[in-house]
Amino acid sequence: MSQSMSRTALYDTHLSLGGRMVPFAGWEMPLQFQGILAETRAVRAHSGLFDVSHMGRIWVRGRQASALLDWTATGNISGLTQGRARYGLLCTHEGGILDDGIVYYLGPEEYLLVCNASNRDAVWRWLAELRDSRFQDTELDDRTMEVGMIAFQGPDAHAVMERLSPDLPGSLRPFRCASIQVDGVTVLIARTGYTGEDGFELMPPADASADIWKRLLETGAVPCGLGARDVLRLEAGLLLHGTDMNIRTNPYEAGLDRFVALEKESVYAAALRQVASQGVGRKLTGFRMLERGVPRHGYTILQDNLEVGEVTSGGYSPTLDSYIGLGYVAMELTAPGSRFVVDIRGRQTEAEAVALPFYSRRRG
Amino acid sequence: MYPDNRRYSREHEWVLIESDGRALVGITDYAQEQLGDVVFVELPEAGTQLDQSQKMGEVESVKAVSDLFTPLTGEVAEVNQALVDHPELINDDPHDKGWMVRLASVDATQLDSLLSASEYESFLAELG
């Protein structure tokens, strides 16, 4: 491994648990522990732990903090009440998706943006540019290295957290965040995740991460790597930036327009209002294979031997026991039931468009 | 740990000569461990003629696609149909239930070009 690779505070913990480490977005991260499919099943059935400390954590503070975020994040940030979080896209003046992430409203004039590891530098530069040009009364503070982040996901997670932290607010509903004590350590906790299960994301000080991780492991949570995280998010129909969308994709093509507030003044408003009124020619769809075969990023989608799209994500879903994928296709092929063919390294394999998500948990 | 009743290739296939002279072929425990969870296997049709080291199929794990090569020249007499529905057998039992093809009309002299169990284990040790 080159010396420029970053390690999270849990690196040694991963090695001791037999994690298979791989380079990812400049970090050495565990791809898997016991195995990708077993980890995926554990999260769906009980609970799993993910080190997501590689993700960017940028605090935005000051009188213009919400105005800056509102200028580029597609969700309505100034409309948030304290202790709530909102998913959104960071869009540019052309309406392209620079990144996606969650904005947490922590306290008066204090917000936290959690963004993708691969985009952390680009997001930082973009926010700094906005601060310098229009929102000078804002302080940006990248605390990725000082604060850890652990995702604790699965149907058992809520009961376990209530036991571990008596001061966990009973009202900590989805997309709420709060500061709690776990074994005397102050931890920022949010009811968010990237798996399609109920669960939490915990942000302790980096040097307390290993103790929190160990405490959660003792409750029976299974350590999970990036492999299971990717399977889980795909089953839940959650897009991955850089794979399923990028700066050349707009939220309408990505099927994420429900997260776009068009009415507010913003850097993207003019571009995306035009997209909204004109419509798009291609759009992301979910699909499942009608024959055996693993669709993968970059494979061509065909109909009547004509290229009509491209696969962006795909794989075997252990939860559904079928092969599923995401891809961009001509608009008319996004209707559920539409048939097309995926070219799997020369093998023409039948597929059918399906509505997203592929999997949604029972709520109760 | 590798059974010494068979020979191994440097591409991590094993071949077991059966009492009737036919050859059973699969991938090694090391190979399945490196691949991770296998989710799809494509095997040749019965009757296919294969030359030693020729590509005979593909195995896909969650993360990657790998080619399968035949360690011996021969004719595909049978493929393990159970793998089509249960590719995880390759992870669970690579040296037995996870066998892939049965070859007839093999050239037994080619076995000399393959590794014994102890030679294969030394080869793995060199890989680190």
Name each region found by the language model.
Chain B
Residues 21, 62-64, 72:
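Periplasm/extracytoplasmic soluble domains of Gram-negative envelope assemblies
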Residues 67-71, 104:
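Histidine- and aromatic-rich ligand-binding microenvironments
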Residues 36-38, 62-65:
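A short beta-loop-beta micro-motif enriched in histidine and acidic residues
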Residues 1-55, 93-128:
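Acidic, low-complexity mobile loops and tails
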Residues 86:
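Basic, polyanion-binding surface patches
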Residues 61, 81:
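Short, conserved catalytic or interaction motifs in soluble domains
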